[in-house]
C-alpha cells in the first residue's frame, strides 16, 4: 500500500501538479480562474493554510483555509473557511479525505478560530467531523425591465419632513478597499445580519481589482458591485443603510435594463430588495446550503451577537469527540446582546439539552430546538429552555460569497 504523508504545502511545491489535481477534481479552469487560483494558493501556502496529502511524493489530495470573519447578529466572529478540498480520483475511498480534514480541523483549532464553514460537495465526511448544515446562498432572478421603476418609500412610514435626497454615486476600485470594507461591515452590524463574511484588505482589494467587476460607492453608507455574465447582469452585492442610498445603487444597476433582459445574484432572504420592486416577479431560483463547525464552543458564544432584548439561561451537555475541550456540562447565559458558556463544575443537570457538535453548530445558526430534536441532533431539555434557546439563537443565516 502506498504511504500517504499529510503536510503543509509550501511556496516551493509543484503548483502545476496542484493545479492538475484541482482540475481533475473540479473541471478545467478558465485562464482567469487559473490565475486567481494560483495567486490564492501561493498566498495560503505562505500563511501555512494550504494542506496537502502526498502519495510517494505525488499530490493525492489537498485543502486550504481562508482567514475570514463571519457576522452573527451583527458581530464579526473569526472564521476559517475550508475550500478546495479534493482527493485524486485514483486515491479515493482510502480515507485520505477524512485524514486530511482531521488534520485541517486541528490546524483550525490551533490557529484560534472559534468557527469554521464550508460549501460541501458531499456532506457525510464533514458531518462525521462535526460540521452541519447551517445556512444558504440564495440566487435571485428578476427581469431587468422590472427594475426600471422602484417602489417609492411609504410616506406614512417616513413621517413629517421626510423628502427625496440625492445620493452621490462614484466608481470604486482597489484604492477604496478600506472604505468598501467599512461600508460592508457597518451594513451588516446595522442589520444584525447572520452568516455573511468579510475579508481582509488584501483579498478584498484583489476582488475589487477584477477587470470584469464594476463597483460603486454611494454617499458614505453604500456599496454595490456587479459584472456581466454573458448577456445577463450578475449582482455581486448591494449594501446600504438608508433608503435613499439603496435606491441610488439599484438605480445604477437598473440603468442596464435597456441592454440586458435578466438580472441575477446572491441575496439574503430578507434583503430589502424584495420590497423595492413594483411587481412580484423577482424569485429565488437556486439555494445552496453551507455547513458550520463550532470549533471552540465557549469562544464562539462569547463572540456571537444575541438579540439585545432577550435574557435566557439554559444548561447544556455537549459531547464532541473530535474537539474534547467542547465536551462537558455547561451553563449558557444570554443578556444585553451577549452570551457566555461556562462550565458548571461537571455536575449534570436533568434539564440539560444534550448535543453533539453537529447539534451545537445548527443551534448556533438558529435552528429551532424542536427541529434539532426531530432530526436526531438533540435530546433532553425542557419546553421552557427550548423557548429560551430559540429566542436567544434566532437567526436566518445566509452568505453571498464563494470561497
Q: Could you tell me what each predicted segment is?
A:
Residues 119, 132-150, 155:
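Conserved catalytic-core motifs of GNAT/GCN5-like acyltransferases
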Residues 84-87, 93-106, 110, 243-254:
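Conserved acetyl-CoA-binding loop-helix of GNAT-fold acetyltransferases
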Residues 1-67, 73-81, 147-201, 231-234:
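Short amphipathic alpha-helix that is part of the acyltransferase structural core
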Residues 2, 11, 157-403:
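Intrinsically disordered, low-complexity, positively biased terminal segments
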Residues 122-125, 131, 146-147, 174-177:
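Short acidic/polar capping segments at secondary-structure boundaries
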Residues 110-114, 120-139, 270-285:
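Conserved active-site alpha-helix within GNAT-family acetyltransferase domains
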Amino acid at each position: 500500500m502506498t504511504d500517504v504523508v499529510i503536510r503543509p504545502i509550501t511556496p516551493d511545491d509543484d503548483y502545476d501538479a496542484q493545479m492538475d489535481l484541482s482540475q481533475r477534481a473540479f473541471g478545467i479552469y478558465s485562464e482567469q480562474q487559473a490565475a486567481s487560483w494560483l495567486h490564492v494558493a501561493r498566498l495560503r501556502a505562505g500563511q501555512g493554510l494550504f494542506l496537502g496529502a502526498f502519495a510517494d511524493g505525488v499530490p493525492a489530495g489537498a485543502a486550504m483555509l481562508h482567514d475570514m470573519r463571519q457576522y452573527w447578529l451583527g458581530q464579526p466572529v473569526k472564521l476559517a473557511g475550508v475550500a478546495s478540498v479534493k482527493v485524486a480520483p485514483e486515491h479515493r475511498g482510502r480515507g485520505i479525505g477524512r485524514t486530511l480534514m482531521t488534520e485541517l480541523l486541528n490546524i483550525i483549532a490551533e490557529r484560534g478560530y472559534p468557527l469554521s464553514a464550508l460549501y460541501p460537495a458531499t456532506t457525510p465526511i464533514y458531518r462525521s467531523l462535526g460540521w452541519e448544515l447551517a445556512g444558504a446562498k440564495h440566487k435571485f432572478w428578476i427581469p431587468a425591465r422590472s427594475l426600471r421603476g422602484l417602489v417609492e418609500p411609504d410616506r406614512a412610514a417616513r413621517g413629517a419632513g421626510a423628502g427625496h435626497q440625492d445620493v452621490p454615486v462614484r466608481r470604486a476600485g482597489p484604492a477604496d478597499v478600506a472604505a468598501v470594507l467599512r461600508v460592508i461591515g457597518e451594513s451588516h452590524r446595522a442589520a444584525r445580519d447572520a452568516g455573511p463574511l468579510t475579508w481582509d484588505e488584501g483579498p478584498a482589494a484583489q476582488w475589487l481589482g477584477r477587470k470584469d467587476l464594476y463597483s460603486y460607492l454611494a454617499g458614505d453608507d453604500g456599496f454595490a458591485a456587479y459584472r456581466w455574465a454573458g448577456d445577463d447582469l450578475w449582482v455581486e452585492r448591494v449594501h446600504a443603510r438608508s433608503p435613499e442610498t439603496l435606491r441610488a445603487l439599484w438605480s445604477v444597476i437598473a440603468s442596464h435594463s435597456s441592454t440586458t433582459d435578466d438580472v441575477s445574484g446572491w441575496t439574503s432572504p430578507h434583503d430589502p430588495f424584495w420590497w423595492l420592486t413594483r411587481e412580484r416577479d423577482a424569485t429565488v431560483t437556486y439555494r445552496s446550503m453551507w455547513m458550520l463547525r463550532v470549533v471552540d464552543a465557549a469562544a464562539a458564544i462569547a463572540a456571537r451577537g444575541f438579540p439585545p432584548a432577550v435574557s435566557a439561561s439554559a444548561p447544556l451537555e455537549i459531547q464532541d469527540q473530535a474537539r474534547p475541550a467542547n465536551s462537558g456540562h455547561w451553563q449558557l447565559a444570554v443578556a444585553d446582546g451577549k452570551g457566555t458558556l461556562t462550565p458548571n463544575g461537571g455536575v449534570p443537570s436533568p434539564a440539560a439539552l444534550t448535543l453533539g457538535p453537529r447539534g451545537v453548530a445548527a443551534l448556533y445558526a438558529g435552528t429551532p430546538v424542536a427541529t434539532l430534536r426531530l432530526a436526531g441532533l438533540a435530546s433532553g431539555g425542557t419546553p421552557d429552555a427550548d423557548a429560551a434557546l430559540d429566542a436567544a439563537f434566532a437567526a436566518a443565516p445566509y452568505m453571498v460569497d464563494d470561497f
